[in-house]
C-alpha cells in the first residue's frame, strides 16, 4: 500500500491487550507528524472470565492448541470490534484511517525467530469496517531484533525532553523502560516482571485479579532469601537489547523457586517479596544502564500500585518519580496510544522500530495491513 502524502493529523484507533490478560485498552487519537498526538476518547473492556481462562491455558502447550488458538482469536476479534464500536459511538467508521491492534501474545520467542499475537485482524477489519494493522513484532524479529519493546519509538517521539534525562517505565504484566537522554542513544528493554507475578499470586490465594494499590503486599514483609533467589534469574544477567514474557516469569517457575528454599512462607510474605522483586529489578536497570537519569515516569497498571510506586521512589532517591499524567498522558492509555501511532507509521510507510532498542539490523516498516 502506498504511503499517504498528507501531513495533516488523522484519526486512528489503538487497541492494547497485554500480558496481564485483564482486558482491552482502546483509544481514539488524532495523530500527525512529529510529536502531534491528541487523545480524543478511551474505552476499557474486561476480558470475560471464560476467555481469560482460555488465553491463560494457551500459554501452556496442550492438545489441539492450534484449533483452540484460532477459536480464541475469533473471540478476541469480536471483543475488539465491540470495544471499537463503543469507542466510536456516533462516529462514522469510514472517517478512521486505521486500527492499530497489538493482539494477545501467546508466545514470544525471538531466539527461535518467532512471536505469536492472536486476534484475527481480518475478522476485526470485517466487523469494524476499518483497516487494521496488526502483527507489529514479526518484522523486527525477521530483521534480527527482539520484536520488543516497540513502545520506546513512541516514547522518544512524544515524551522526550531536549534538556532533561527522562526514563519512561511501562509497568504492565512485564516491566520495560525507555531511556531518553537529551544527548545520547535512545534505548529500551524489558527489565523483568511487572504486575504479572503479583497478579497471579493474589489470584491463586484470594481470587482477585490484582492487588489493589499493593495493599496486600504492603501488609507483608520481604523474605530476603526468596528475593535473592528471584534476583538470580538468568534473564536479569543479560544485557540489553532483550525482551521477556510469560516464558521467563510465571507461577510455575515461582513455585520451583519456592520449593528450592526449603521453608514455607506465608502467602502475604511472598506477595510483598514479589512487589520488591519488580521494584528492585526495574530500579537496578535504571541505576546501571540509565546513568544520570533525572526523571522517571511510570505508566501502565503499575502506576496505580501505590506500594510499588513508593518502593521505586525509595530505591531511586536522586530521581524524580511520578507518572506520565504529569506529561499530559494518562498512564492507563500510553500503550494503546503507542499502537495507534505505530499504525500511523505503517500506513504512511514509515519505520516503527528503533534498532538500538530491539537489536534489529535496521529500521523497518512494521505490521500487516488488513484493508477494511
From Swiss-Prot:
Gene3D superfamilies membership: 3.30.420.40
Pathway per the UniProt entry: Amino-sugar metabolism; 1,6-anhydro-N-acetylmuramate degradation; Cell wall biogenesis; peptidoglycan recycling
Coiled coil start-end: none
Superkingdom field: Bacteria
Pfam families assigned to the protein according to its UniProt record, in alphabetical order: AnmK
GO biological process: 1,6-anhydro-N-acetyl-beta-muramic acid catabolic process; amino sugar metabolic process; peptidoglycan turnover
UniProt catalytic activity: 1,6-anhydro-N-acetyl-beta-muramate + ATP + H2O = N-acetyl-D-muramate 6-phosphate + ADP + H(+)
Keywords on record: ATP-binding, Carbohydrate metabolism, Kinase, Nucleotide-binding, Transferase
EC number: 2.7.1.170
Catalytic EC class: transferase
InterPro entries in the record: Anhydro_N_Ac-Mur_kinase (IPR005338), ATPase_NBD (IPR043129)
GO function term, MF aspect, one: kinase activity
Residue sites binding ATP per the record: 18-25
Cited function: Catalyzes the specific phosphorylation of 1,6-anhydro-N-acetylmuramic acid (anhMurNAc) with the simultaneous cleavage of the 1,6-anhydro ring, generating MurNAc-6-P. Is required for the utilization of anhMurNAc either imported from the medium or derived from its own cell wall murein, and thus plays a role in cell wall recycling.
Family of this protein: Belongs to the anhydro-N-acetylmuramic acid kinase family.
NCBIfam families: PRK09585.1-3
Protein name: Anhydro-N-acetylmuramic acid kinase
Amino acid at each position: 500500500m502506498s504511503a499517504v502524502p498528507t501531513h495533516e493529523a488523522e484519526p486512528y484507533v489503538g487497541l492494547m491487550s497485554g500480558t496481564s490478560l485483564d482486558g482491552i485498552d482502546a483509544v481514539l487519537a488524532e495523530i500527525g507528524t512529529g510529536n502531534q498526538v491528541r487523545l480524543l476518547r478511551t474505552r476499557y473492556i474486561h476480558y470475560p472470565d471464560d476467555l481469560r481462562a482460555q488465553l491463560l491455558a494457551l500459554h501452556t502447550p496442550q492438545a489441539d492448541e492450534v484449533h483452540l488458538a484460532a477459536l480464541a482469536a475469533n473471540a478476541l476479534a469480536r471483543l475488539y470490534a465491540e470495544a471499537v464500536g463503543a469507542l466510536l459511538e456516533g462516529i462514522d467508521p469510514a472517517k478512521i484511517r486505521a486500527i492499530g491492534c497489538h493482539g494477545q501474545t501467546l508466545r514470544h520467542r525471538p531466539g527461535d525467530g518467532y512471536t505469536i499475537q492472536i486476534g484475527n485482524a481480518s475478522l476485526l477489519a470485517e466487523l469494524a469496517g476499518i483497516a487494521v494493522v496488526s502483527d507489529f513484532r514479526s518484522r523486527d524479529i525477521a530483521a534480527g531484533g527482539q520484536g520488543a519493546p516497540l513502545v520506546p519509538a513512541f516514547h522518544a517521539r512524544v515524551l522526550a525532553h531536549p534538556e532533561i534525562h527522562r526514563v519512561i517505565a511501562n509497568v504492565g504484566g512485564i516491566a520495560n523502560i525507555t531511556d531518553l537522554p537529551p544527548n545520547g542513544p535512545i534505548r529500551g528493554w524489558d527489565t523483568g516482571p511487572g504486575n504479572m507475578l503479583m497478579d497471579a499470586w493474589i489470584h491463586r490465594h484470594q481470587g482477585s485479579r490484582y492487588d489493589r494499590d499493593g495493599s496486600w503486599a504492603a501488609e507483608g514483609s520481604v523474605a530476603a532469601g526468596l528475593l535473592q533467589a528471584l534476583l538470580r534469574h538468568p534473564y536479569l544477567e543479560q544485557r540489553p537489547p532483550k525482551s521477556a514474557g510469560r516464558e521467563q516469569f510465571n507461577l510455575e517457575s515461582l513455585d520451583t523457586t519456592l520449593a528450592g528454599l526449603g521453608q514455607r512462607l506465608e502467602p502475604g510474605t511472598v506477595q510483598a517479596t514479589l512487589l520488591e522483586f519488580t521494584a528492585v529489578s526495574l530500579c537496578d536497570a535504571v541505576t546501571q544502564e540509565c546513568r544520570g537519569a533525572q526523571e522517571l515516569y511510570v505508566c501502565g497498571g503499575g502506576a496505580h500500585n501505590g506500594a510499588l510506586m513508593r518502593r521505586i521512589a525509595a530505591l531511586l532517591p536522586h530521581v524524580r518519580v511520578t507518572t506520565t499524567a504529569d506529561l499530559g498522558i494518562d498512564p492507563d492509555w500510553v500503550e494503546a496510544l503507542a499502537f495507534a501511532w505505530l499504525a500511523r507509521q505503517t500506513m504512511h510507510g514509515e519505520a516503527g522500530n528503533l534498532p538500538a532498542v530491539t537489536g534489529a539490523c535496521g529500521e523497518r516498516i512494521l505490521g500487516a495491513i488488513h484493508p477494511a
